[in-house]
């Protein structure tokens, strides 16, 4: 192309990716902010937990808060790879909502530490050294450190595993609190975040399927290897700090859900499934981990989860 030639569409929005545009619009329709939820309402529920149970949820939220960096580093690297504005605009929405997730996790952490920020700092510095968290981070670092040998399709398999597998047991464990009518606001934010991450993983599947033409896909053997490793790590993470008395959560049901979820993502990218686990029982508490069950936050938001608006005009 000569210096005088250019594509006019570079200078205005042109829809090119209907699948990504739909996910972008879905993300916009379901925007929310952490200040719309009143986390202080959950503070009384800390007294309902045993010491083991409280430590378990502190550990879960320690990982979730730290994991935002794993996602955002990858997003920063991926967003520049595509000229299509639909993909760029989708990623702008994802990056925005990831910052909301980060602030939400910080607020929820403080609830479990009874607003003692110093105690949280001490705990986090020790918890991130725990083998169950380090194994996740080291596994991701090993994949990322393959450098130029890691193809673009493999990077998207990595994103599918980060967002679609490495959060699943945490989301499920949090959702079990609802069965005991405690931490209602935390459960509400967990519903919203798990829904967001389902959208994000679906977007990675769409890009992998439709927008990586010219890039050879990894073999089924390679994909299965990565999925099996991720599922094993995720299931081990769940039991690392699980309460000795399983009063709140069903570990077997959550691990089965992790494997079922892996099969679902494999099917979405056209790869044979690995596991025999059935769909979760209808009573399984993680109600919003599928797009089919997506609802707009503002359709069911109530004052119980909203901050107080002061009219000072």
Curated annotation (Swiss-Prot):
GO molecular function: metal ion binding; ribonucleoside-diphosphate reductase activity, thioredoxin disulfide as acceptor
One example of a Gene Ontology biological process annotation: release from viral latency
Binding site for Fe cation 1: 68, 98, 101
EC id: 1.17.4.1
Entry's localization field: Host membrane
PROSITE patterns on file: RIBORED_SMALL (PS00368)
Reaction(s) this enzyme catalyzes, per UniProt: a 2'-deoxyribonucleoside 5'-diphosphate + [thioredoxin]-disulfide + H2O = a ribonucleoside 5'-diphosphate + [thioredoxin]-dithiol
Cofactor: Fe cation
Binding site for Fe cation 2: 98, 163, 197, 200
GO CC annotation terms, alphabetical: host cell membrane; membrane
Assembly and oligomerization: Heterotetramer composed of a homodimer of the large subunit (R1) and a homodimer of the small subunit (R2). Larger multisubunit protein complex are also active, composed of (R1)n(R2)n.
Function in brief: Ribonucleoside-diphosphate reductase holoenzyme provides the precursors necessary for viral DNA synthesis. Allows virus growth in non-dividing cells, as well as reactivation from latency in infected hosts. Catalyzes the biosynthesis of deoxyribonucleotides from the corresponding ribonucleotides.
Protein name: Ribonucleoside-diphosphate reductase small subunit
Species the sequence originates in: Psittacid herpesvirus 1 (isolate Amazon parrot/-/97-0001/1997)
Taxonomic path: Viruses, Duplodnaviria, Heunggongvirae, Peploviricota, Herviviricetes
